[in-house]
A protein has these predicted regions:
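Nucleic-acid endonuclease domains
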Residues: 1-79, 84-136
Length: 136
């Protein structure tokens, strides 16, 4: 998508755009994506509603809200702004408390390489995790 609704090099613009997700469900994101047909939307509801699928909610937000192609690059999702996107579901317990539905993986750590890096502030872990946008 050429005309993004946010400036991909601006962390403030990304955050401000993400605020549009407040009080929205993942289903709402699909319903409001102007780039998919009703037929495709039905298939996507089924695909993203698979309880065995890990990471699919993050992919839904990446593709249908932020409109960028899903990738497995080790750099931050919004690399130009230095912002990493993390999406995680939660459940509401009987007493009303929130509980993480699954563990949240921040990044894959190469223990040998990151251990050898003497300056933590220059490590892959720090570069990837320094600024995160957490959506739940």
């Amino acid at each position: 998508m050429d005309n993004l609704p946010y400036i991909k090099s601006s962390k403030e613009s990304i955050e401000n755009y993400a605020l549009n997700l407040k009080e929205k469900t993942f289903k709402d994101v699909l319903l409001n994506d102007p780039n998919i047909t009703n037929e495709d939307r039905s298939l996507l509801f089924e695909y993203y509603n698979n309880p065995r699928s890990k990471g699919s909610l993050g992919q839904l937000i990446e593709k249908h809200f932020f409109f960028y192609d899903i990738n497995s690059k080790s750099e931050a999702d919004f690399n130009e702004a230095g912002v990493e996107l993390k999406v995680t579901p939660y459940t509401i317990k009987a007493n009303g408390d929130l509980r993480a539905k699954e563990r949240l993986v921040l990044t894959i750590i190469n223990y040998m390489k990151d251990y050898e890096e003497e300056d933590f502030l220059r490590s892959h872990v720090y570069e990837k995790c320094a600024l995160m946008l957490l959506i739940y």
